[in-house]
Amino acid sequence: MYAVKLNKDTLLPREKLVQYGVEQLSHQELLAILLRTGNKEKHVMELASHILHCLESLADFDKLSLQELQQLPGIGKVKAIELKAMVELCHRIQKAKSSHSIQILSSYQVAKRMMHELGDKKQEHLIAIYLDTQNRIIEEKTIFIGSVRRSIAEPREILHFACRNMATSLIVVHNHPSGLTNPSENDVAFTKKIKRSCDHLGINCLDHIIVGKKQYYSFREKSDIF
């Protein structure tokens, strides 16, 4: 019997990953592995190619909601959930890498980072950034998704994670999906409440920052609360 010698182009994506390493796979091949199966009309590789052609770039995966993912050809609810989970896991891995030992030197530094992270979000996200004595990031924690109004009377969760991380300082950030960053009365009330609560526990609340896609508002820079 003669052995058939296979090259990269003749191997299936999983076989190619094992033999040559994940770095050698194309976007299409990686997506095909995640999809696992095709549909009645298309083989999984054809389906992966078609989906990628429907997107302007890979970054669009991060922007699509669960419902929008299901509108892509060949993507049902289960595959949409799996893709959404994959994107979020990648996002968290990248965040963990980029956050490690970063020292916060200004509100603008935080705002720039969070504009990139939250600028395209369609719901309000309330995030607390916990810092050590050198203002290095210990943890970035999503406290709430929905409306900051629900969190105004309940700063205890923010402070719970501050104590758990033994943080000496924290910065609170939330986004306005409208892109407009002027603070509302609720934003001002929330800022005063979290500042008082932090002072009571001896934790330094450095700022509350509101971000949109292209602008931000810093209470430390523009108000007398801090």
Swiss-Prot record:
PROSITE patterns: MPN, UPF0758. The lineage of its organism: Bacteria, Bacillati, Bacillota, Bacilli, Lactobacillales. A motif (JAMM motif) lies at residues 174-187. GO terms for molecular function: metal ion binding; metallopeptidase activity. This is UPF0758 protein SUB0843. Zn(2+) binds at residues 174, 176, 187. Residues 103-225 form the MPN domain. Pfam families: RadC, UPF0758_N. Belongs to the UPF0758 family. Keywords: Hydrolase, Metal-binding, Metalloprotease, Protease, Zinc. It comes from the Bacteria. GO terms for biological process: proteolysis.
